[in-house]
Amino acid sequence: MPFRPQRLALLMLAAIPLIGQQYSHLSGLIRDPSDAAIVGAAITVANEETGFRRSAESGADGGYGIASLRPGTYKITVRKEGFRTIVRFGVKLETAQPARVDFTLPIGSMQETITVEGGPSLLNTQDAAVGTLVNRERIERMPLNGRGLLSLLELAPGTVVTPATRGEAGQFTANGQRPNTHYFTLDGVSVNSGVSGGGLPSQSTGGSLPGMTALGSLHGLVSLEALDEFRVQTSTTAPEFGRLPGAQVSLSSRSGSNEFHGAVFQYFRNEILDANDWFANRQGDSRAPLRMNDFGGALGGPVRRNRTFFFLSYEGMRLRHSFAWRSAVPSEQARRSALPWVQPMLNLFPRPNGGPLGEGLAEWTGRNQRPSRFDTGAARMDHALGGRITLFGRFSFAPSQSEFGNTQVNQLTMESGSVTAGMNARLSPWLVFDTRFNLANASSESLWWSTNPDAGTQCYFEPVTQQFFRVPGLCDFQFRFSFAGVGQAVWGRESDRGQKQWHLVPMAVISAGAHQIRAGADLRKLRPLRRDRTSALNLIAENFVDLLNGRNLWSAFARPLAGESILSEVSAFAQDSWRIHPRLTVTGGMRWEYAPPPRLSPLASSPDLLEAYRFDNQTEIWPVRYRNFAPRAGAALKPFVNRDFVVRGGFGLYYDSSLSIATDLVNGGPFILSRYTNPKNAPFSTLLSYGFMPGLVLPLARQWNVTAEQAFGGRDVLSLSYVGSAGQRLLRRELGAPVSTQSFQIALVTNHGASDYHGLQIQYRLRSPRGINGLFAYSWSHSIDNSSSDSALHWVSTAWRATQDRGSSDFDTRHSFSGALSYSVKPNTGSWWRRARGAWELDAIVRARSGFPITALSSEFALGVGFANAFRPNVAGGQPLWISDRAAPGGRKLNPLSFTAPTSETQGNLGRNSLYGFSMSQIDFALRRRIPLNDRAALHLRFEVFNALNRPNFADPVRSLASPLFGQTPSLLNLMLGTGSPGSGLTPVFQTGGPRSVQVVVRFQF
């Protein structure tokens, strides 16, 4: 019988159901006053909020272990005949973080009880992972723009928010990993089941895009009101974590307790107290209108005390906003002189309101006010069957819609829903089973139109289609016009997509003396759908003058694509955490990834599509491989008995099993199997297709780190880490030699990508008895690669070498700092001044980083296709690269005289990403007042300010030499980081780098 991984997975399911990644694990040692092990001590752990209990006994070495504990606050009771009983309250267990609590039992009667309070050690003495926990207290207190997760993710060292693209919207990088390599889980199951809204859905179809709303926010995963806490792990995670090599973000949702608790809130902002956009000020425009209402509530409590609990949450947002934008558009003279069939394309752009820029272009500065909205609701139930079995179920639903644009408008409509169920069973003192199942569904529809009323209706572009097809009445098209130096204009239905996920996660935990063994499996099926029924026409001009004259244009036509693929993923792992010595714990294990090629349904429009995939009569899109084994090892050592000092280190292999590349040929358009016609080479035309390099394998990352941690005074912790990684066989899309010809071009997905990252990271956790609580992180690092994106297309020639494109990563950030600080003034009695000063709280988030690297390009098009690396210019000697200009945004701009275009389609001597853009710094703060209403209820009033100092943070300069705005920044940073969709980042009003904005909050909480 042939080997089938699916059969192996089914056997594993029968044998080893699994423990969820969001659980915590408690262990420790029980000793007597002489430091000898106490055997047979009874340990009882009880959740202080729900009453849930688990028990264990200490072994021959005095050690104990209790697995599968939900994050929360616990009471631990330790009893042994001949010793006094110890009860420790307030032991906080955190998401995806093992905890250790040791006890020394005094000699005496067991009826005598000693009560102490305090949690586990502040130091991680259990594993080598580099990570950061964000708890409920910090979630509630921090000023979070848009009340989203993205601001909190930046608090982990090594993480940086990055510009999103239409193809990849990961929105942040972690320790040099690409932005589309992060894995999000909620309550132990994957929430990387989002769907993109753009024409390049590659990240979403492969299951590497988290569930987002139409605004690009992560509320599609979980609203902050329903989030208990989360942990971000960025290096050398244990074998139970995997699928993607980037950050592992483990989210835990809130549940009910024995006491009713809840909140009702309203977040409001408008432009009255806001600062004006820097570009609007320069233009003499007033502040842009802004209306934001974020409202909702939550309620949790018992259905039956100590047994059944519920938690409900709802959040809704209504937003109308606009942004100042500067762009080059066709001049009035150009519109009048253009050929009749060209004029409809020019009218997609708004009419100029600024001075001439030359070559038929003029300046336009303007703003578009557009509405956005989302609603997200969730319900969770928890039930305990005695002290051994717990059950839970969770349902969520999140519809959303957003409109955004500068010269054109994009309307995106999305829906997502999810159902999760889980069971946890302690079958014996040494064995715990856990199984979870998730079903998720998401859909999106994207439409484009122009803000210029002269653009008319869809059939307004009939003269364009007649020019190329000579058939009247062709109106049902999506049009995309790209002009070097200007950008692109889009009209029509861009995409109609869906995504379904089935996810089954079983695991087992065995506690055997000094060993804690975990083994399990992870089975996921994805079904990305494409329902695009509209043909697409793309026109590209290398310069604007050619467009006006209707010559030297590349044209591309794509037929409608409708179909689906079925992607199956199987993972398995086994690991052992071995307490070799009371001060040394070693964790080692293996993870196995199986990611076969997808099963594709026939496409009605392209029944021969599969034939285009194959090389040398391959029967699969790429070879099936069963040897994707990833060993990992780590150790934590406490070298000194009486010092709170720990040294940790680890190493591991991590596969990128995302299958985004598997559906590029089906979903990676919009121009799939398109025919590009270049009049310069007439009568020839170029057939553009997509394919995979023969022998394609999963990308691989090697990660390693060494960390030293020191605790101070039982409250503060300083961590110093060296973190490194090396990416091999990374995906890189290439077009050109040697497989392409003049009449047939193939864009190949290859394994030619490579990367390196080295970083020094410092984190300081502060908790002062005077009411000060802080978390600070600094990173000094360098990330290098020859491609920073799976979806970007690279030009290669016969003379191309991999080192030609090697340079700083697109997201390389040499220096980055983040800090979260809270200060609480305790209520006072006495004078009116003392009473007024009390109950005030101040919170702040600080962010600062150096600039992103940029590359000047002499041309972004070749063969009618946009490239990430085509073509870099030559650097002219004797000229400064940057010149000071007080009139330019940021006071400087790139010097056009420093760059000259190559004489042919070749790379110049300017290195990739050898220039750096503007740095960023911003302070957000919140002033809060708590007004007690009774012992359990209070009214919270908050005043939040984002970019409190109103420091202008500028976007990177325009990089195309063909643009009249070359070298100058077109907007503030928030517009570069995102434009507001899951395919192009979080909406700018919630991004870092915008003008100062003020928010007022009223919240009732009990």
Placement of each model-derived feature along the sequence:
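Transmembrane beta-barrel strands of outer-membrane/channel proteins
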Residues: G118, V264-N270, L312-G316, G393-F397, ...
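Hydrophobic, lipid-facing positions within transmembrane beta-strands of outer-membrane proteins
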Residues: G170, A226, P245-A247, N293-G297, ...
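Signature of Gram-negative outer-membrane beta-barrel scaffolds
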Residues: F477-A484, Q488-R493, K500-H503, Q516-F640, ...
